From Swiss-Prot:
The record marks D75 as: Transition state stabilizer. Catalyzes the decarboxylation of four acetate groups of uroporphyrinogen-III to yield coproporphyrinogen-III. It comes from Gluconacetobacter diazotrophicus (strain ATCC 49037 / DSM 5601 / CCUG 37298 / CIP 103539 / LMG 7603 / PAl5). This is Uroporphyrinogen decarboxylase. InterPro entries: UROD/MetE-like_sf (IPR038071), Uroporphyrinogen_deCO2ase_HemE (IPR006361), Uroporphyrinogen_deCOase (IPR000257). Keywords: Cytoplasm, Decarboxylase, Lyase, Porphyrin biosynthesis. SUPFAM superfamilies: UROD/MetE-like. GO terms for molecular function: uroporphyrinogen decarboxylase activity. The lineage of its organism: Bacteria, Pseudomonadati, Pseudomonadota, Alphaproteobacteria, Acetobacterales. Coiled coil: none annotated.
Length: 353
């Protein structure tokens, strides 16, 4: 076990801690008035790539709630942008990218650009680690108690946006390419797999104590494609991180994977499995490798609703995992209309002894 005063890091390393540590996906976001005040200062990419702004945004929920984890403020699409794919975030539409549909499109991507392009992200992580590990309180949080998390999009989910050129509910063009031009799609996935591993190692070197892979659209794939485009790339990334930076926990989040989630947990070599809202925590925990840390999985819409129902379900999830390494989180990200007071209520509920 890890000799550390950081509860989250202890649990990510496989130790059961009571009450469990808590952090939330999208804990730094539009539901916070202090985030909205900064949002008008710069566009989204500029906020991600400006260390002063990204550091401040990352720390906002730490100051307010003393979360046990601080996750880097960035975006899963920073990687394709860093490789040279055009990217813009359009109000009301979301991300717009220059779609990858041919060998010529793929050839324009240059993974060698990534270290220089993402240098501001690494500077943000370095600053955050110094602040979090320093002696001074960070608002409501004690210095030396908060774990710094890096992250990336998993290759399939990032490929969805790169091929489609925008967000979608089904990503038909992406899934179609995987069937109709498997060689091209495999080359894209291979490029993303190596670039993702390299970027996560760089994040670790810059200060991240654990990293998370978000595979938000993995649930779109049937089992054979899931094994090929979700499990295999994730396993390769985890193996690369373990070989280059042994002992650093990797959290996997195969959203909406359903019955494939257990196979994903067994076959990827991950230390931590994040479960989405649809998973029965206790039942799924019984299908996972012994001692594997579980993260999740309160419904974000129940957090939005708040009140006794939220508190009751939060206690039920927490109590069902007692005695097992468990990180309390949501089953997806905080939704923008969530009252900040509800997040505070949740944190207090989870930390009840």
């Amino acid at each position: 076990m890890t000799d550390t005063g950081k509860p989250l890091l202890r649990v990510l390393q496989g130790e059961a801690v009571w009450p469990p540590p808590i952090w939330l996906m999208r804990q730094a976001g539009r539901y916070l008035p202090e985030f909205r005040a900064l949002r008008d200062q710069a566009d989204f990419i500029t906020r991600c790539m400006t260390p002063d702004l990204a550091t401040e945004i990352t720390l906002q929920p730490i100051r307010r709630y003393a979360m046990d984890g601080a996750i880097l403020f960035s975006d899963i699409l920073i990687l394709p942008w860093a490789m040279g794919q055009s990217l813009d975030f359009v109000a009301g539409k979301g991300p717009i990218l220059g779609a990858i549909r041919s060998e010529a499109d793929l050839a324009r991507l240059d993974p060698k650009r990534v270290p220089d392009a993402t240098a501001p992200v690494m500077e943000t992580l370095s600053r955050l680690r110094a602040i979090l590990d320093g002696p001074d309180p960070i608002g409501a949080a004690q210095g030396g108690r908060v774990t710094l998390l890096g992250f990336a999009g998993a290759p399939f989910t990032v490929a969805c946006y790169m091929v489609e050129g925008h967000g979608s509910r089904e990503f038909d063009a992406t899934r179609g390419m995987a069937y109709s031009d498997p060689l091209l799609f495999d080359r894209l996935m291979a490029t993303l797999t190596q670039a993702t591993a390299d970027m996560l190692v760089a994040q670790i070197d810059a200060g991240a104590e654990a990293v998370m892979l978000f595979d938000s659209w993995s649930g779109l794939l049937p089992p054979a494609q899931f094994r090929r485009h979700v499990i295999a790339p994730t396993r390769a990334i985890v193996q690369e991180i373990q070989a280059r930076r042994p002992g650093v926990p990797v959290i996997g989040f195969p959203r909406l994977a359903g019955i494939m989630a257990a196979e994903y947990a067994r076959e990827t070599g991950l230390r931590v499995m994040a479960l989405d809202t649809g998973a029965d925590m206790a039942a799924m925990a019984g299908l996972l490798p012994p001692g594997m840390t579980v993260q999740g999985n309160l419904d974000p819409l129940l957090l939005l609703a708040g009140g006794d129902a939220m508190a009751q379900e939060a206690r039920a999830i927490r109590d069902a995992m007692k005695g097992r390494p468990h990180v309390f989180n949501l089953g997806h990200g905080v939704v923008p209309p969530t009252p900040p007071e509800h997040v505070g209520d949740l944190v207090r509920t989870v930390r009840e002894v």
